[in-house]
Amino acid sequence: MEKEVIAYLDNETIIDSQSVKNTNLKEIYFDNSKESLEVIRHSCAHLMAQAIKNLYPEAKFFVGPVIEDGFYYDFRVESKIGEEDLVKIEKKMKELAEAKIEISKYEITKNEALAKFQNDDLKQEVLLRIPDGAVSIYKQGEFEDLCRGPHVPNTKFLRFFKLTRVAGAYLGGDEKREMLTRIYGTAFADKESLKEYLTIIEEAKKRDHRKLGTELKLFTFDDEIGGGLPIWLSNGARLRSKLEHILYKIHRLRGYEPVRGPELLKADAWKISGHYANYKENMYFTQIDEQEYGIKPMNCVGHIKIYQSDVRSYRDLPLKFFEYGVVHRHEKSGVLHGLFRVREFTQDDAHIFCMPSQIKEQVLEILAFVDNLMKLFDFSYEMEISTKPEKAIGDDEIWEVATKALKEALDEQGLKYGIDEGGGAFYGPKIDIKITDALKRKWQCGTIQVDFNLPSRFKLEYTDSDNEKKQPVMLHRAILGSFERFIGILTEHCAGEFPFFIAPTAVGIVPIGEAHIAYAKEIQKELLELNIDSEVYEKNESLSKKIRTAEKQKLPMILVLGDDEVAKRSVALRDRRAKEQKNLSLDEFIKLVKEKMSEVHF
């Protein structure tokens, strides 16, 4: 069957089929391509709004954009809408889709639009946010809404969709404004793709790090402490400590020096850096001795001051500082999400001060570091370079040198990468590291950022080989991004079944009776000397219940100890990953776990 054209692509702009006058544009067919799904999902958001309007005539709508993997619409309605109402909204959407309603577009002036929607305060809000000029309106049946589009030409294209959840959302993301209802959904071009996506969604619910974090006793949150401030429990703290230890060793082997800057800096420092003018709303400030101080949202200023603490020569470069830096950033309560979006987090942060000629060499080394670490946790990854934006500091030559160095480093490593033209920060180009988890979801984690700005603002210098003062380039580099976010991603990636070398509790030791506890404690001590955490299940419970408790904690290994094991100094091993049970001497078991720990190599 021949695919139908639903829109056209003009460079990177998607245009409605009905708006096209130039027939030389690239056709967008009705399929699951990125461009097609954007049109389908945008249209499906309007289909949902039309269904809601039919069911709740008093409903008023704010905005309904396409997001990654779907869409949402924010609206006001008198009735309280819950998850149970999604079924009837979906049913109405299907009726409208089956009715094959033509979707048309027309344009009016902004003033005409303000008059047309004069009794709709939410539409007035939308119109106040857009520039003067022509305003486009999409119409399907009796339903009309403001929208830039594009949309499919007919509701018949909107058959394979699912409404996924209901939430609250502040008007315009402003916590001081009213709370609107938000419904999320997704849509595809065919039934199979929708079914596959919904299967992944169900699996993602089981793997949700917030759910597993509670079940595995990794972390918690407390309203009396405050939103976005994670509390690490013993298991989570052990997991995090193991990750920190691995990273520390890799950093040291790669020539990084550990440093630590203060968490509180005078506002003057943030004024020099530009954070005060450009990032103040995301920071926390306080007064000490009638002077203003800011809690750091980033670690770079502290590292700059460490660079400035000594006279630097070209022979000293590159200088590589790293820190597990605790930072605080003000996030609106509505966007806080488990460990993924918090107000306090710890970055695996490093700053490299080097000469422009050393950028490529340093980026190559960072890429090797990234590859090493991602393979360790079984993540695939991809890269994206963001280039010079319209507004930028630094001359074209230094931008060209830096961007070329990033591209050459990626090419030399044989890594595929995308290019976000003009998407760089004003102070330098960057590489974004995006990892793919077991559910094929992509996560933005690390960044390699070239910076000409801060060295200039703080007047950093080194003495060159010709005895002249030169300004170094600064590379900001985080591989995990933050420990919190990465641990959240890792928890979902492995469904809480952490690799042996990083598991908070790697071995569960189950003595059958009281007579076997002493031997269990002996094994526990021996494992601890190998930096392997274990737990002895010594409660007065049945053997099956003890084993079940250990299995619920998703421990990599469980040892069962009875009279025979005590007498022979052996263990009955249950290996979760290998899905096998076997008897080993204690010496053989210790050899086995040593081998597992040695799998972590750099």
Curated annotation (Swiss-Prot):
It comes from Campylobacter jejuni subsp. jejuni serotype O:6 (strain 81116 / NCTC 11828). Its main location: cytoplasm. It holds the Pfam family tRNA_SAD. It is found in: Cytoplasm. One of its GO terms (cellular component) is cytosol. Its cofactor is Zn(2+). Keywords: Aminoacyl-tRNA synthetase, ATP-binding, Cytoplasm, Ligase, Metal-binding, Nucleotide-binding, Protein biosynthesis, RNA-binding, tRNA-binding, Zinc. One of its GO terms (biological process) is threonyl-tRNA aminoacylation. It catalyses: tRNA(Thr) + L-threonine + ATP = L-threonyl-tRNA(Thr) + AMP + diphosphate + H(+). This is Threonine--tRNA ligase. Binds 1 zinc ion per subunit. The lineage of its organism: Bacteria, Pseudomonadati, Campylobacterota, Epsilonproteobacteria, Campylobacterales. GO terms for molecular function: ATP binding; metal ion binding; threonine-tRNA ligase activity; tRNA binding. InterPro entries: aa-tRNA-synt_IIb, aa-tRNA-synth_II, aa-tRNA-synth_II/BPL/LPL, Anticodon-bd, Anticodon-bd_dom_sf, Thr-tRNA-ligase_IIa, Thr/Ala-tRNA-synth_IIc_edit, ThrRS_anticodon. Zn(2+) binds at residues 300, 351, 476. Catalyzes the attachment of threonine to tRNA(Thr) in a two-step reaction: L-threonine is first activated by ATP to form Thr-AMP and then transferred to the acceptor end of tRNA(Thr). Also edits incorrectly charged L-seryl-tRNA(Thr). Belongs to the class-II aminoacyl-tRNA synthetase family. Its EC number is 6.1.1.3. Homodimer. Residues 208-499 are annotated as: Catalytic. Gene3D superfamilies: 3.30.54.20, Anticodon-binding domain (3.40.50.800), Bira Bifunctional Protein, Domain 2 (3.30.930.10), Threonyl-trna Synthetase, Chain A, domain 2 (3.30.980.10).
